[in-house]
């Protein structure tokens, strides 16, 4: 798989996460934003939302778990691949990451790192899931993220 997504994030690690059309319009007009995380929409609007991002020359990543009318099953990823121009997905579901990778889509596996069990879960799952990136929430955890980066080879 091409490294376009990884290179875009490396070049500019600020990623726009949009929750509504107003935020989408604003980030599409900013030249320093290369990647857009789409955190809203439904099955009727997602193709148009993605099209706006692509017309602005940006990488479109859809948070599958937040799109109205989509299940959190592999068929949802196939729907997005076949009906939108999305470059990839964001999800909390390892099975959806696997499916997206099969379809040559970029992947971000989102974890909520709330305790040591969740931490161990990240370490064990990343060997079988192989996302392009891991997103760790809550975001204000620099010490834990630094420790995690020392233990795994996937960009965090």
State where each predicted segment sits:
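Structural recognition of alpha->loop->beta junctions
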Residues: 29, 78-90, 124-135
């Amino acid at each position: 798989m091409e490294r376009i997504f990884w290179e875009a994030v490396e070049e500019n690690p600020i990623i726009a996460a949009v929750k509504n059309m107003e935020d989408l319009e604003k980030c599409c007009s900013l030249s320093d934003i290369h990647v857009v995380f789409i955190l809203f929409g439904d099955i009727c609007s997602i193709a148009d939302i993605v099209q706006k991002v692509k017309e602005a020359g940006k990488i479109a990543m859809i948070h599958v778990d937040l799109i109205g009318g989509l299940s959190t099953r592999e068929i949802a990823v196939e729907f997005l691949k076949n009906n939108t121009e999305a470059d990839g997905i964001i999800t909390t579901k390892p099975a959806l990451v696997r499916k997206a990778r099969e379809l040559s889509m970029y992947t971000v596996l989102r974890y909520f790192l709330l305790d040591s069990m969740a931490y161990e879960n990240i370490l064990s799952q990343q060997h079988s899931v192989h996302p392009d990136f891991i997103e760790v929430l809550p975001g204000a955890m620099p010490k834990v993220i630094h420790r995690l980066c020392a233990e795994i080879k996937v960009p965090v």
